[in-house]
Amino acid sequence: MPSEPKKKLDDTETQGAHAQAAHALGPDEALLHGQYRIQSYLSSGGFGVTYLAHDSLDRPIVIKECFPVLTCHRRGRSVIGRTREDAATFSTIVRNLMHEARRMARLNHPNIVGVHQVFEENGTAYMALDFIDGLDLLEIIQNDPRRLTPKVVQSILKKVLKAVAYMHDSNMLHRDISPDNILITADDEPVLIDFGAAREVTNKASKTLSSLDSVKEGY
């Protein structure tokens, strides 16, 4: 479930983002006994909320929170199931996500986002990920296509394919490869993010969510 170590947001964007994600934790919230402190909301999807944070050494970190909106809601800081049945489903999602995230943490590849830590708090699961200072490939395609010269595109494709092959050799599937899940650094280095582990687990855990594709449509 890692997702989305996106570019930093300015103060105006951050305020707007928080207004759009009322279920997100607020700025300056501490996690793991103060080891991580949230700076701002970055993004959210059907299965998680992503934050920019800093660790105890004041280094930028991305925090991904397991938050499947169809099965849970926030009460204070705690994340709980909407119904008794949802609570059982959510518990299964968290348990399996922790397992998948620990497997991801063993991956070590320059073109795959690094997992620093996996932990449980507030009744849900969290992943601490590398902060990648860059734009996702979809943003570049839409807003700066001239940057994608044939040479750059060829380099990106080769490196992404090598990263995918490395994952397959490690008996793992990404399941959600698309331009918005490939970050591009200032040096045109691609980094795979957002592994969609919770999506795979949810499909197994709940008939309610079984209509959701475990592999992104079109990719």
Predicted features, each with a name:
Residues 39-45, 50:
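Protein kinase glycine-rich loop
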